[in-house]
């Protein structure tokens, strides 16, 4: 009763208290964010979600390295932490991000999303606008599962429901550089797409734009998008920022990584971008009010040599001309629209989304440049120098080497989408890469967005079917479909047929599970501590028991397989030794024949020739047969051996005796009651 009252009061407290997503404080000076990056990392294909349990404890070999991310408490920055096999996702949050006026900053979900992200522990969080300054949630590599679709965008009105997990992973390149600051701005990685997260209208500000998940300053009146500079432009009002409770670290130390060492990791970045993009002399995002479900893309810091081939440096003179043509034409776009932001490298395409096409504000020269770049399978880069720092650079083409960047600039790449016909229908999410990815039975899909451009080392197993094959949007242009790769295909492994012989015979290599689930002391204590929780406790105990039974079956299967393998090995050795004995005897007879004129082999060699090769094949065969009999012997007897009171039959006998005694006691009590009733009454 006390436990029930405690749980009810706890639920009421959680329901009435809104936990802020972060603390907002008015301050004109930006702060460094204390990033905690630690823990062993796992192979992405081995990271699965099984119910409430993370499985997979293998040392990661480059480039697929990941660490888990869950929701974050007030004042605590996102952390990369170590997770072990069997660890549970205990803390997930409903997320509602709003601006100071209370307007939601999240995008509307695509029409094909039917299910919501789910967590075991539910808390409702509301926060103010995190986009102007500071970071609320880290979007690079943060994946929210919507009905088999792993998206990097949280959608408006989609809530967490108890029962599943919202899983998030990043690679080591991202979590080393996510909060880094240095010199003129934040260090960014050279990935393949850059995009704004939300676009909204706020009074006189025609196009308030911010970057979700990026530490940045922006001038809302000038519509800068994710372009931090050394001296942030002033905002009309006090700028909010994160008020941290942890001690800030020297972020410049996080920047001392060798860019070349991260080349392999770029193939599996959290944003799902796997290709290297040609860098430019000075890159900034275009002023076209774009919005996408992809996270903000970092770029390398200034004067950093980049790895890659066939890089093309675009002229900035054309960029300046484009700036003049576009400064007066700012398209208006609802905050929920999304657009394709993809990079058509030589043979790779990015995961992207389509929505209602934008208004075409570029001139004919820009469109022709886009068409030419698409025909040469190179991304069309449209750059714009930051406000107040117009710079020009020399135009070079088809040149390898480090990019020369102007001061106060940040490399952020945008690939302009090809012109699309006018349409008001919102298109569905689709994928630009075809992958056959195995979804093992009992597991949730391991983070589609992070593996979309990553190499898949395993092939689909037989007896599988396609469960998700999203076709490209019907509104996509012909040029875009021409460059698009086949669509992604997920496969789901069937459960074994119950009619098949699935016993742990150990006769084949695949009969037994190669892994044993060893529970740690902490997990034992956790299971014991959670066993009292209603509904969840029995599940924990059932999981624990199921794992123990599975371990026992695996051990039995392994022993049988060991016996079978030992018997087979002995049979092979017996055959080899028998053949060698036969060949030795034949050779000895041949030698005796050749040495007959000299009195035979023993006459020549003396006593050393008296060596007999004993035939022990019969004994070995008997031992092999005994191993097979022991391996096939089942413990189905009544246990009559040993002490009778401890054997199976003895236990049954004891139970029978207790039952008879109980009946006798009941009869005696009944008789006593009657006697008392007769004489006393």
From Swiss-Prot:
Extracellular side: 19-648
Pfam families: Ebola-like_HR1-HR2, Filo_glycop
Region feature Receptor-binding, mapped onto this chain: 38-188
Disordered, as annotated region: 223-427
Disulfide bonds: 37-610, 92-119, 211-226, 512-557, 602-609
Region (Fusion peptide): 529-549
Low complexity composition bias: residue spans: 337-347
Additional facts recorded: Filoviruses entry requires functional lipid rafts at the host cell surface. Essential for infectivity, as it is the sole viral protein expressed at the virion surface.
Name this protein carries in UniProt: Envelope glycoprotein
The organism of origin for this protein: Lake Victoria marburgvirus (strain Musoke-80) (MARV)
